């Protein structure tokens, strides 16, 4: 019996038999010792008692084995679970998606909790709350009724499904429709704690908290008056209606479209505008004379609007004039750019043809018998049929000079000479005849102009010279002043002294010698005069006594002078 039960147990747990074999053997040894003791004690009672005890012992052994197997199974399962837990804790989770999913589950759970909490709160009008907007911190505000809101704010209520609360912000009193997710209750304790904490805060946020503290309920809230609603409605109407500037701009735009012909648009004729030929320059008349367009303006603001129309219309007209000028300048600039580009492209193509013809026929080392005349014929045909050629292109590229040289070229093969020269002659005599005549006339005019200019310059020079000569003859030379004369004399004296030192006696010395000679001659003449007087006196004395003439005293106080001595 024991062997059968053991085999059944082994069949039930074949994988775990090896692990618990040591425990089973130890228990079998203990049971065997116990059985041997029982056999010894009961040997005296007889063989039957021994058999009974053995059977009982075998049954107990089987029960013990089953209990041990169960306990070993439980221990093994516990150890396996512990090993699994240690493996999971030791190995780090490399899957980032699992971590994100766990975090998202946590955040969703928190959000659900918050939404549940916010849904539980019943936000009533007059309740102070903190409202969250994107880009701003939680801002103090108050839940209000729709009657406290302006018409514009009431119209801005969201149409999607859900509950939305009208909120007014402190201190600017701006309205917003928001859901319960963006609201949290604001108590007076939270306000005082915020204001007492020394955290960095903005002035507007502090002002908002102070205003929320001073307005505990809806009755103490001062809502914007109805005038602001009227002004908002008027501003909406003004924004929806076109201004005079926009009307003028639309009119000018329609006129431009019809002028260009890109879009066909019917324009009604207004007979009242016949007296205004320049509508853009007088925008005020445009606004006043158009009865079809009526501006809806409140009576309070009609006077101000009428006063402000004239400067706005003037600005509009000036802006339109500037725009027209800019467009005209831009169109002119675009036309100039296009003309420059076309001229440049034509110039490059003519220079290419000139280079090909010159290199193939006019190069000094070129053998004319080995030239590919098919290419030459192709180049000449392109030149003959060239579109857009004019005088500036011919003058700048000098293509006509190359064609003339090819036309007068000698040494061309007889097979190709007639063909080449016929094309060149056709270009010079027929196709470019008028252009070449114009160039020659321009050259003649330039030469004539240069000659006339030279002649006029020569005549001007001659007239200037003649006028200078006449002026020198007619106008006397001015005499230099006295000071200048004295300076000149001193300079001359100094120069004479220098010459005397270097070259011997000068003219002054000669003059002094002449002066001394004159003095001597004068003395001689005076002596001769005295002798003649003495002789005359002697002659006068022959009438009476012989004596010298008696010179009486001079009349009228004239002193007598002794001629011999020269004294009085």
Swiss-Prot record:
Signal peptide positions on this chain: none
Gene Ontology MF: a single term: methylated histone binding
Residue segments, region Disordered: 1-126, 213-340, 465-568
Domain PWWP, residue spans: 125-189
Basic residues composition bias: residue spans: 255-266
GO biological process terms held by the UniProt record: chromatin remodeling
Protein name: PWWP domain-containing protein2
């Amino acid at each position: 019996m024991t062997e059968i039960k053991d085999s059944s147990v082994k069949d039930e747990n074949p994988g775990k038999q090896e692990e618990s074999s040591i425990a089973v053997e130890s228990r079998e040894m203990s049971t065997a010792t116990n059985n041997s003791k029982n056999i010894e004690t009961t040997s005296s009672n007889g063989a039957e008692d021994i058999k009974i005890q053995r059977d009982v012992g075998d049954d107990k052994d089987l029960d013990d084995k089953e209990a041990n197997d169960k306990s070993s199974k439980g221990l093994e399962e516990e150890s396996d679970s512990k090993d699994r837990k240690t493996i999971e804790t030791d190995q780090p989770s490399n899957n980032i998606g699992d971590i994100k999913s766990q975090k998202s589950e946590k955040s969703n759970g928190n959000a659900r909790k918050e939404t549940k909490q916010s849904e539980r709160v019943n936000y009533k009008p007059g309740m102070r709350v903190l409202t969250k907007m994107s880009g701003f911190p939680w801002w103090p505000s108050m839940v209000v009724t729709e009657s406290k809101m302006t018409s514009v704010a009431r119209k801005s209520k969201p149409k999607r499904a859900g509950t939305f609360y009208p909120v007014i912000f402190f201190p600017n009193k701006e309205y917003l429709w928001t859901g319960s997710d963006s609201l949290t209750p604001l108590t007076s304790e939270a306000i005082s704690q915020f204001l007492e904490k020394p955290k960095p805060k903005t002035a507007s946020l502090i002002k908002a908290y102070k205003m929320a503290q001073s307005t505990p309920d809806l009755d103490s809230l001062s809502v914007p008056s109805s005038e602001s609603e009227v002004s908002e409605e008027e501003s909406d109407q003004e924004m929806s209606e076109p201004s005079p500037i926009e009307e003028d701009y639309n009119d000018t735009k329609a006129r431009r479209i019809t002028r260009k012909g890109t879009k066909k648009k019917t324009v009604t004729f207004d007979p009242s505008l016949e007296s205004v030929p320049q509508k853009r320059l007088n925008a005020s008349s445009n606004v006043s004379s158009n009865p079809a367009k009526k501006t809806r303006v409140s009576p309070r603001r009609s006077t101000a609007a009428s006063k402000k129309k004239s400067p706005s219309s003037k600005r509009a007209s000036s802006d339109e004039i500037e725009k027209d000028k800019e467009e005209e300048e831009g169109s002119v600039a675009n036309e100039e750019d296009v003309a420059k580009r076309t001229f440049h492209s034509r110039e490059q193509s003519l220079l290419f043809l000139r280079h090909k013809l010159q290199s193939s026929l006019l190069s000094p080392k070129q053998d004319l018998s080995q030239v590919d005349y098919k290419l030459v014929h192709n180049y000449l045909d392109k030149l003959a049929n060239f579109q857009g050629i004019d005088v500036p292109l011919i003058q700048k590229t000098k293509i006509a000079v190359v064609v003339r040289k090819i036309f007068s070229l000698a040494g061309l093969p007889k097979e190709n000479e007639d063909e080449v020269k016929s094309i060149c002659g056709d270009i010079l005599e027929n196709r470019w005849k008028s252009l070449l005549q114009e160039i020659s006339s321009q050259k003649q005019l330039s030469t004539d102009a240069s000659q006339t200019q030279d002649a006029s310059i020569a005549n001007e020079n001659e007239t200037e010279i003649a006028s200078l000569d006449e002026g020198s003859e007619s106008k006397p030379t001015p005499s230099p002043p006295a000071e200048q004369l004295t300076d000149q004399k001193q300079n001359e004296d100094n120069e004479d002294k220098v010459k005397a030192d270097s070259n011997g006696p000068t003219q002054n010395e000669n003059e002094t010698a002449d002066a001394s000679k004159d003095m001597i001659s004068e003395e001689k003449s005076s002596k001769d005069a005295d002798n003649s007087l003495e002789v005359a006196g002697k002659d006068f004395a022959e009438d009476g006594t012989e004596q010298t003439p008696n010179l009486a005293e001079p009349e009228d106080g004239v002193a007598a002078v002794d001629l011999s001595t020269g004294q009085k």
